């Protein structure tokens, strides 16, 4: 991986459906299986470093 955070699991926030808190932050995460950045909604809790503010930022860090 270009950077370690890109190898972390898809960034979610602790809930099976991906949203466990009341925040609504459109975000991007690198999906190592698909080898591409994908969009998701971050709820504001938990998660990991595989979370980026834009597709461009994700691609610059991970692709």
From Swiss-Prot:
Pfam families: Kunitz_BPTI
Source organism, top-level taxon: Eukaryota
GO molecular function, one term: serine-type endopeptidase inhibitor activity
Site (Reactive bond for trypsin): 22-23
InterPro entries xref list: Kunitz_BPTI (IPR002223), Kunitz_BPTI_sf (IPR036880), Prtase_inh_Kunz-CS (IPR020901), TFPI/VKTCI-like (IPR050098)
Keyword Disulfide bond: yes
Disulfide bonds: 6-62, 21-45, 37-58
Keywords: Disulfide bond, Protease inhibitor, Serine protease inhibitor
UniProt cross-references to SUPFAM superfamilies, sorted A to Z: BPTI-like (SSF57362)
Repeat as UniProt keyword: no
BPTI/Kunitz inhibitor domain segment(s): 6-62
Function: Serine protease inhibitor. This peptide can inhibit, in-vivo, acrosin and, to a lower level, plasma kallikrein. It probably plays a role in Drosophila reproduction.
Name under which the protein is recorded: Male accessory gland serine protease inhibitor
Organism field: Drosophila funebris
């Amino acid at each position: 991986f270009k950077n370690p955070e890109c190898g972390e699991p898809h960034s979610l926030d602790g809930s099976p459906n991906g949203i466990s808190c009341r925040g609504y932050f459109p975000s991007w995460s690198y999906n190592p299986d698909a080898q591409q950045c994908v969009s998701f909604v971050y709820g504001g809790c938990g998660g990991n470093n595989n979370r980026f503010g834009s597709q461009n930022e994700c691609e610059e860090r991970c692709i």
